[in-house]
Amino acid sequence: MGARVTRALRNFNVEKRAEREISKRKPSMAPKHPSTRDLLQEHRSQYPEIEEVVSKKDNKLLSLLRDVYVDSKDPVPALPVKVEPRQEPKEFRLPIGNHFDKNITDIPKGKITVVEALTLLNNHKLSPETWTAEKIAQEYYLELKDVNSLLKYFVTFEVKILPPEDRKAIQSK
């Protein structure tokens, strides 16, 4: 039922709406730059016959255009195209352990590795009096605002192991 109603609304007064759209003013050309306008006026005044030639229909060209017939067909492929199944990319894993960063040798000033970031976060966490933001920025050649953002928004994981006697205190339901 809903499609019938929407179709009726969509087709309501179609001719009138189409006629209104067709009779609208067409968009005009963008205004020309004043220097270009002057050059065009000068060129038109020197060669007035060009405008006549451009606006006149050339019967010879029109007759040649009427004789043109284009018939296109897709060429038959000589060999059948083999569709091979796409190969899945091989699985890539980083080596196990902390030795995966050995390939990183040259780090520009103002940048740090993940290991260095974790180290400085841990140092600041363990002794914030000695590892202040200013000292970290000076040590790792970083900007102070970046170090402050790093210390504010990033923290290292804290693993808490509950002693066995605390587990007994928690009763199951």
Curated annotation (Swiss-Prot):
Modified-residue entries (Phosphoserine), positions: 35
UniProt keyword list: Calmodulin-binding, Lipoprotein, Membrane, Mitochondrion, Myristate, Phosphoprotein
Pfam families noted in UniProt: UPF0240 (PF06784)
Locations listed in the record: Mitochondrion; Membrane
Membrane topology, from the record: Lipid-anchor
Lipid moiety-binding residues (N-myristoyl glycine): 2
Domain of life: Eukaryota
Segments crossing the lipid bilayer: none
A GO CC term assigned to this protein in UniProt: cytosol
Family that this chain belongs to: Belongs to the NDUFAF4 family.
Name of the protein: NADH dehydrogenase [ubiquinone] 1 alpha subcomplex assembly factor 4
Lineage: Eukaryota, Metazoa, Chordata, Craniata, Vertebrata
